[in-house]
């Protein structure tokens, strides 16, 4: 019986190393698989982070483009309104010129007449409204400035030096600092 028991023990002891080897090999294989899975997981995570960065950068660019377009549209809208006001102002200039001419003519006939006074009040109110909207007359003082004045003739003048404004023939106007129409003037030329 001891022999039988020894044989079984020998048989089991021979099987044990094989089982241990198989178990160790299995554990090694599992460890390698875990490392592979961990490596794949890291690779997937890196890919995800790269894609996230790309998408985030695209989002930031699109958002910046959107903000730029929004600002450009606001600026274009503002410029369109500005242009519309400028066009209206240009259309009003002949009316203003006609009122100025009527006032001058009425003042030549009778400075104290009701018509002259009415035209004066009308011109004052018109200039107030125009100034409120950024339209103002160009100053025509002594100095000629080609940015604001258009010299359409030169005249001899004993009172004025060369290049000085002698007479304003047509009033000039500015809209928010930009010249709508330069003032038509005559300048002194004394040779």
Curated annotation (Swiss-Prot):
It is found in: Cytoplasm. GO terms for biological process: protein folding. Its main location: cytoplasm. InterPro entries: GrpE (IPR000740), GrpE_coiled_coil (IPR013805), GrpE_head (IPR009012). It comes from the Bacteria. The keyword Cytoplasm applies. Keywords: Chaperone, Cytoplasm, Stress response. One of its GO terms (molecular function) is protein-folding chaperone binding. Pfam families: GrpE (PF01025). Residues 1-22 are annotated as: Disordered. Homodimer. Participates actively in the response to hyperosmotic and heat shock by preventing the aggregation of stress-denatured proteins, in association with DnaK and GrpE. It is the nucleotide exchange factor for DnaK and may function as a thermosensor. Unfolded proteins bind initially to DnaJ; upon interaction with the DnaJ-bound protein, DnaK hydrolyzes its bound ATP, resulting in the formation of a stable complex. GrpE releases ADP from DnaK; ATP binding to DnaK triggers the release of the substrate protein, thus completing the reaction cycle. This is Protein GrpE. It comes from Helicobacter pylori (strain Shi470).
């Amino acid at each position: 019986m001891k022999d039988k028991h020894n044989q079984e023990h020998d048989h089991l002891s021979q099987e044990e190393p094989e089982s241990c080897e198989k178990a160790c090999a299995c554990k090694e294989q599992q460890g390698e698989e875990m490392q592979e899975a961990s490596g794949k997981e890291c690779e997937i995570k890196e890919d995800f982070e790269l894609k996230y960065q790309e998408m985030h950068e695209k989002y930031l660019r699109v958002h910046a483009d959107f903000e730029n377009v929004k600002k450009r549209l606001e600026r274009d809208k503002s410029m369109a309104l500005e242009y519309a006001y400028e066009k209206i102002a240009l259309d009003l200039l002949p009316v203003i010129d006609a009122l100025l001419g009527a006032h001058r003519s009425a003042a030549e006939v009778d400075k104290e007449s009701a018509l002259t006074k009415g035209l004066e009040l009308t011109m004052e109110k018109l200039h107030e409204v125009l100034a409120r909207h950024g339209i103002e007359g160009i100053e025509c003082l002594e100095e000629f400035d080609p940015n604001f004045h258009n010299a359409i003739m030169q005249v001899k003048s004993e009172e004025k030096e060369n290049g000085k404004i002698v007479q304003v023939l047509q009033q000039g106007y500015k809209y928010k600092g930009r010249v709508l129409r330069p003032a038509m003037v005559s300048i002194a030329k004394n040779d």
